[in-house]
Amino acid sequence: MVVNAYAGLTRPTGYDNMFNWVFGGVYGGDANKGSESNDQSVLNSVETYAVTATNDYLLNKWKDAYYGAQRCNLALNVMKEAADMDETTTANWTAELKFLRALFMFEGVKIFGPTGMPYIDETIAAEENDPKVHNGTDIYPNILADVEAAIEGLPEKQTEVARPTKTAAKALKAKILMQQGDMAAAKPILADIIANGLSPKGERLALQDDLDANFNATTENGKESIFEVQFSVGA
């Protein structure tokens, strides 16, 4: 179930994925939808800053945050009942899942705000996951608590490159702090990553000699990479 939680990082449609082409590139003015006016016409409202609550791009972005987080919650609860897991494996997987849950919820917060989404963790029973649950509470502290647990529990280098590392968790914390506008708190974390961070393969982080290497399948997980996951075709 831990591996299953990673499925939340990829979605079957392109408009709600984590690379945020819609809510980052198009909304930010760096990209245009193109094509014909009746092709994904709801994207026009995003591009013209006229999004309403009926826009299904928003609905899917909302669902994706909880789709991913719930997979983490299910895995965490199953692990609590597992009798044949050693402490090291349990600690590592728990840290992985909390990293992923923080990432999923942060993706939602970037769109809906820190008081626009209820924080649902593994302690909340399924019958309590009602869409009417109070969502007026700032969930940044919850997200940051997950990130801190990930920083504490993740290793510097994983045995499998797609799993998050301590460097990845630190980078996520810095991104969250910057999203909150706390550049002063993020700066020393980023400086530490630059000086001591490791790539998924355990290399010292550094800029690639050729920028294209970051987007080339033959050089994936390179020295400029902090966290990336490869999926099978159709996954």
Label the model's feature ranges.
Residues 114-136:
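Short coil/linker segments at helix-helix boundaries
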Residues 3-14, 36-111, 134-141, 147-161:
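Conserved, well-structured interaction surfaces
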Residues 101, 106-108, 121-123, 209, ...:
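Glycine-rich, histidine-containing beta strand-loop boundary motifs that form or position
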Residues 56-57, 124, 156-157, 228-235:
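A broadly tuned preference for mixed-charge, low-complexity surface segments
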Residues 44-52, 63, 112-113, 118-120, ...:
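Generic, ordered loop/turn and secondary-structure boundary motif
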Residues 1-39, 117, 140, 144, ...:
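An aromatic- and glycine-enriched ligand-binding surface/loop that stacks and positions planar moieties
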Residues 109-111, 116, 158, 179-182:
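Short coil/turn linking the two alpha-helices of tandem helical-hairpin repeats
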